[in-house]
């Protein structure tokens, strides 16, 4: 650069012009999440706004999940076999929200079926409007084990985050 400057400063009064190659401005590409691989034996694709967090040793993964009214907590745990019955698990979650237990028939009426990378799975919303607390829970059979994904937030947060929650659950696959 200095050499160019010195050569351009001659004694004559001629105007010199130089041409420099244009560099391309970086293109802002949309952020695409790639599947996260880890030592758990499972991979997933999480929404860009979710923040990995520390959880208990029982959790395969933990995320802070922002929504307009605050921050939700998402956990992924793995249990052998079925991890207990659907009725036992859902009623445990209901008790955590100070709600009465339900029969398996009542629970199954509220469950929604989905298909994802691990196959068929179920999601249930458990909401206690009086406490302003809610869970969105998925039960995903995975061979000889079951994954449980639970999002804890307020009822408004559950409704806001539900689409991302379903996408996350559907993205879960077994890593090889």
Question: How should each PLM-predicted stretch be described?
Answer:
Residues 4-72, 79-118, 127-132, 140-145, ...:
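N-terminal targeting sequences that direct proteins away from the cytosol to non-cytosolic compartments
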Residues 124:
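Hydrophobic residues at beta-strand termini and immediately following loops
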């Amino acid at each position: 650069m200095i050499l160019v400057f010195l050569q351009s400063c001659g004694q004559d009064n001629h105007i010199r012009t130089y041409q420099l190659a244009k560099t391309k401005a970086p293109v802002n590409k949309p952020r695409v999440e790639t599947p996260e691989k880890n030592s758990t034996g499972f991979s997933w694709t999480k929404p860009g706004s979710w923040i990995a967090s520390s959880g208990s040793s029982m959790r395969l993964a933990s995320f802070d999940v922002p929504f307009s009214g605050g921050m939700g907590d998402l956990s992924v745990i793995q249990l052998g076999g079925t991890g207990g019955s659907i009725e036992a698990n859902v009623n445990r979650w209901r008790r955590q929200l100070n709600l009465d237990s339900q029969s398996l028939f009542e629970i199954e009426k509220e469950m929604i079926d989905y298909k994802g990378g691990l196959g068929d799975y179920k999601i249930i919303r458990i909401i206690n409007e009086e406490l302003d607390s809610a869970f969105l829970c998925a039960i995903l059979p995975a061979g000889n084990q079951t994954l449980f994904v639970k999002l804890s937030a307020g009822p408004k947060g559950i409704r806001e985050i539900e689409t991302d929650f379903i996408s996350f659950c559907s993205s879960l696959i077994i890593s090889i």
